[in-house]
């Protein structure tokens, strides 16, 4: 088994080890042979994140996860142990913890980039991943094979360190009125 302690992967780990990381990505998911495309903006900070994309806004403060659909005025609140579903819906959330969920099966150089094939070592809804990293540890793309047979491909448009946010940033600041359907599964 190859070690994650090598230049691009170590740089990626350091990027997530303190502060926050902002990621803008486009993705395509093949569901029952039909492509579903979209984009997302993610801010990851430790076990917390904020995600926006395709009409949904997701907050995770480390304890609770809110999935908000503004157009249908619905919000689902779950405990953060429901991250399994979040990883399947947006595998880029796993980037901060690649070495906790995967082992390196193989790697190859492609110019100054490194392409990794990773096998899951922990149940996260993803059985295999192919991730391409720039020499500085930035993720350029990923292809994630879900356990249900579907595949998610992501192209990272931008990825950068950003200032650390207050923990309150990772919880919705608004109240959901009586015109909202709120499902609280905590």
Where are these regions (language model features)?
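Non-transmembrane domains of secretory- and envelope-associated proteins
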Residues: 110-111, 121-127, 134-186
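N-terminal leader/targeting segments and the immediate start of mature chains
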Residues: 1-35, 47-48, 73, 172-186
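Glycine-centered tight beta-turn/hairpin loop motif at sheet-sheet or coil-to-beta transitions
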Residues: 33-35, 55, 72, 123-126, ...
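Short beta-strand segments that buttress and anchor functional surface loops
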Residues: 26-29, 50-54, 115-122, 141-145
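Short beta-strand micro-motifs enriched in acidic
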Residues: 43-45, 107, 132-136
